[in-house]
């Protein structure tokens, strides 16, 4: 049976386990958002992934010297179900990367990589795109996307300037594990202190202790070893024989006639009388 100290510790460990499980669920990467673990800042790019109507926006980017224009989405596909970025070549869409929803910090640069596009000209690698996000609070649109360069007609670099690329203090509802654990520990300590201070007086008031001289039932022996010890203890106890007043000296108490006489006359006395 757990002691009074073990029960509170078990409750505390159970609460700590629940906190860690909840924290593990919170640590799953959010959609199109990232936290800078070195500074604690939080960036949410999800507003760039959908319009007010909920449909994914199409970001049109001029290729200028490349000779083609590009269409891309941020964490979504501009086609709804297709590549995250593409360009048109003689009426055919050429994929330059599949959808990815997890931005990352590369040093101090916030980037989002689309990989797994169509085959590159070398027929070995596949086309990919790198979106480089820049915090800009002065632009009058939700974002401005421009093409920075193309490498071997296989890798494409875009710059995305937006106010949504600016870091916020912290995500809403974000709390540290130590803070949550400390709060639970304080509540647990307060409840345990109240229980220790109030439980004993209430128990004495509503369930008064029995007096010491009140007869109590002795606990029955359990287990074969305890029963064996109890049997030999009873066998070793001295017994007092019962004699009839009319029995001759030396007459055994187990005599049938003496027992019948005892029942008829009820004239008995103990051997110590």
Curated annotation (Swiss-Prot):
Gene Ontology CC, one term: late endosome
Disulfide bond sites: 32-75, 120-154, 135-166
Presence of keyword Glycoprotein: yes
Key words, A-Z: Disulfide bond, Endosome, Glycoprotein, Golgi apparatus, Membrane, Protein transport, Signal, Transmembrane, Transmembrane helix, Transport
Signal peptide boundaries: 1-24
SUPFAM superfamilies according to UniProt: Mannose 6-phosphate receptor domain (SSF50911)
Residues spanning the membrane: 177-194
Residues carrying sugar: 36, 51, 69, 153
Membrane topology: Single-pass type I membrane protein
Domain MRH: 30-168
Cytoplasmic side: 195-273
Gene Ontology BP annotations: protein transport; vacuolar transport
Its job: Sorting receptor involved in the transport of vacuolar enzymes from the Golgi complex to the vacuole.
UniProt record similarity statement: Belongs to the MRL1/IGF2R family.
Name recorded for this polypeptide: Mannose 6-phosphate receptor-like protein 1
Organism: Eremothecium gossypii (strain ATCC 10895 / CBS 109.51 / FGSC 9923 / NRRL Y-1056)
